Amino acid sequence: MQLNVNDAQAIEVSELTFGGEFNETLVHQAVVAYMAGGRQGSKQQKTRSDVRGGGKRPWRQKGTGRARAGTIRSPIWRGGGTTFAARPQDHTQKLNKKMYRAALRSILAELVRTDRLVVVQDFAVEAPKTKDLLNKLTGMGLTDVLIVSDAVDQNLYLAARNLPHVDVRDVQGSDPVSLIAYDKVLITVSAVKKFEELLG
């Protein structure tokens, strides 16, 4: 199949990588697994046994007329422990490499099908100036965009860093969430070839 390139000839690309069907279930699974892997999972609360104190019973078992109490750190008491306290846990979900690659292929194919993939011969800025990059993107009609190249250009990265709806990634750093999060994906021809190598 062919992909149109801005201000250049169309290029021949793999049907497998850029022309497959959209597998929504697989993409959802990949996105959930990716986001779960980003969770810190370090939250921790104290149960009744973790809270300092509470060794001596507040009053004797019988004869006071009050309800029985064995410790001042009971979850019922103010200053007591938490009933079902959160514990540190690993949230990562296993996703096979073949499934992950298939999900990326599915996303790329859907970007092509919905005209959200903009292919350019090359994309760079001469100096790390946000204004220059903004003018360049505005001229192309792009406001909410992910820029993907085969290797991140330092000037481009610095210029895009302060723009809230613009991100710069290389092919290796592209993930399912970033590829679907933006209105458009601006990709260089060399990055297209790199995707074909990785996912083909």
Curated annotation (Swiss-Prot):
Task: Output the Gene Ontology terms for molecular function.
Answer: rRNA binding; structural constituent of ribosome
Q: Where is the composition biased (Basic residues)?
A: 54-65
Tell me the GO BP annotations in alphabetical order: translation
State how it assembles. Answer: Part of the 50S ribosomal subunit.
Q: Transmembrane among the record's keywords? A: no
Q: Does the keyword Cell wall biogenesis/degradation apply?
A: no
Q: Which organism is it from?
A: Pseudomonas syringae pv. tomato (strain ATCC BAA-871 / DC3000)
What HAMAP family does the record point to? Ribosomal_uL4_B
Lineage of the species this protein comes from: Bacteria, Pseudomonadati, Pseudomonadota, Gammaproteobacteria, Pseudomonadales
* One GO location term (cellular component): ribosome
Return the PANTHER family for the record: 50S RIBOSOMAL PROTEIN L4, LARGE RIBOSOMAL SUBUNIT PROTEIN UL4M
Name the Pfam families for this protein: Ribosomal_L4
UniProt protein name: Large ribosomal subunit protein uL4
